[in-house]
């Protein structure tokens, strides 16, 4: 089925939309030269550039400048039972990796447990991104805190090309999270790994009356 058919009546809007707010000359448009155009002149070392190229150069979107990553942190951030009950085969970590490969993803991002269980068999077949920290949901009341579940060296030893981490900006523990993640990413770069930061706002004060300012442009931009 063609994309036009999938989009139906919205095809014209999505496929032919032209942004009038920001001229495209002011942004770095994704393309085959993404590494050379955006990253080559940065302070990233050669090994890290190599890892970035491994991400950008894999899967169906290889060397287009676009990246498709399968993220699965069920079992820690989310209930595996609630997520996988309709498809129990995904309780097996290997099937998560197979899904990413069959889907033509650039990489698969998951936990130490999921990726570590199949690293020897699959780390050379699809780029691994190991998520370093997680919010565990068994503590009550939930504190919106990201806790380190492993080390950068563990991720490197299992053959991962990148590590990722989350920071809950605005939360009570955000300053500690910023320090922990920045130190972890510094070491990851020393080892030649790419890094990915997932950013979320978490503060009850951002909600006032009936308005939720977590999505406000000046907070998310």
Regions found by a protein language model. Give the residues of each.
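N-terminal amphipathic alpha-helix/helix-capping segment at the start of soluble metabolic enzymes
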Residues: 1-78, 83, 116-125
């Amino acid at each position: 089925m063609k994309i036009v058919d999938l989009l139906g009546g919205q095809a014209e809007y999505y496929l032919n939309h032209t942004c009038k707010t920001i001229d495209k000359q002011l942004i770095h448009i994704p393309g085959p030269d993404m590494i050379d155009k955006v990253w080559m002149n940065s302070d990233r070392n050669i090994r890290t550039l190599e890892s970035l190229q491994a991400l950008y150069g894999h899967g169906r979107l290889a060397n287009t400048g676009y990246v498709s990553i399968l993220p699965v942190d069920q079992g820690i951030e989310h209930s595996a039972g609630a997520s996988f009950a309709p498809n129990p085969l995904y309780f097996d970590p290997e099937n998560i990796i197979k899904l990413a490969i069959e889907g033509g993803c650039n990489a698969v991002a998951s936990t130490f447990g999921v990726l570590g269980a199949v690293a020897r068999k699959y780390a050379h077949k699809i780029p691994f991104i190991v998520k370093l920290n997680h919010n565990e949901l068994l503590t009550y009341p939930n504190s919106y805190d990201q806790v380190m579940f492993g080390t950068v060296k563990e991720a490197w030893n299992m053959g991962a090309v990148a590590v990722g981490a989350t920071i809950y900006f605005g939360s009570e523990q955000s300053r500690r999270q910023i320090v922990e993640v920045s130190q972890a990413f510094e070491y990851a770069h020393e080892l030649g790994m790419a890094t990915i930061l997932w950013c979320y706002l978490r503060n009850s004060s951002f909600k006032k009356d009936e308005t939720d300012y977590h999505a406000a442009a000046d907070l998310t931009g």
